Swiss-Prot record:
The keyword Amino-acid biosynthesis does not apply. This is Protein FUN14. Belongs to the FUN14 family. The chain crosses the membrane at residues 39-59, 112-132, 172-192. InterPro entries: FUN14. It holds the Pfam family FUN14. GO terms for cellular component: mitochondrial outer membrane; mitochondrion. Present with 1920 molecules/cell in log phase SD medium. It is found in: Membrane. Keywords: Membrane, Transmembrane, Transmembrane helix. One of its GO terms (biological process) is autophagy of mitochondrion. It is a multi-pass membrane protein.
Length: 198
């Protein structure tokens, strides 16, 4: 009992000493400012030296004023005029258009994957029952001859600047033409559905 009481007094006494010590710290005295300023001065000095050394390094690593162009050297050896080729610029334009189309596929695949993944994860049981029931109902109605389902007659309602969503969704998920859409849709769908329920 006395040991616990002494430890408690020691802890409280040390807390009170700490309060008094930090309450009246005279930072304007030369000795105290000198003691507290040494680590700060050292770190500022090292930081400044690092910045100066980095500046000198970057100054020396600047690109030179000369242009090192291999095609220019080849043209000088040919002694012919430098004329741009039309076929090359057409190929570059076509490559750029394909790259933009690829980026659109990746974006749309990721967007639809995240939206459908979160939706399926949040209402998965309800979605499953409604989906199965509607599928069975459509099959029963088609079997009776009351409805006819033809995927070729489905028109795309939403068109985003040269992107046919019907073609992208149906051919993209079932065919091999839009691999960027399929890969990013699948990855986004799986990640969103796994993380939505956590």
């Amino acid at each position: 009992m006395t040991l616990a009481f002494n430890m408690q007094r020691l802890v409280f006494r040390n807390l009170n000493v700490g309060k008094r010590m930090f309450k009246n710290v005279p930072l304007w005295r030369f000795n105290v400012a000198n003691k507290l300023g040494k680590p700060l001065t050292r770190s500022v000095g090292l930081g400044g030296a690092g910045i100066v050394a980095g500046g000198f390094y970057l100054m020396n690593r600047q690109p030179s004023k000369l242009i090192f162009n291999d095609s220019l050297g080849a043209a000088v050896k040919q002694q012919g005029p430098l004329e741009p080729t039309v076929g090359n610029s057409t190929a570059i334009t076509e490559e750029r258009r394909n790259k933009i189309s690829s980026h659109k596929q990746m974006f749309l695949g990721s967007l639809f994957g995240v939206v459908l993944g979160v939706t399926v994860a949040k209402i998965s049981i309800l979605f499953m029952y409604v989906g199965i029931t509607s599928m069975l109902l459509c099959e029963w109605l088609r079997y009776k001859g009351w409805i006819r389902i033809n995927l070729k007659n489905i028109k795309s309602v939403i068109v985003l600047k040269d992107v046919d969503l019907k073609k992208l969704l149906i051919d993209g998920l079932l065919g091999t033409e839009y691999m960027g859409f399929k890969v990013f849709f699948t990855l986004s769908f799986v990640l969103a559905s796994l993380n939505a329920n956590k």
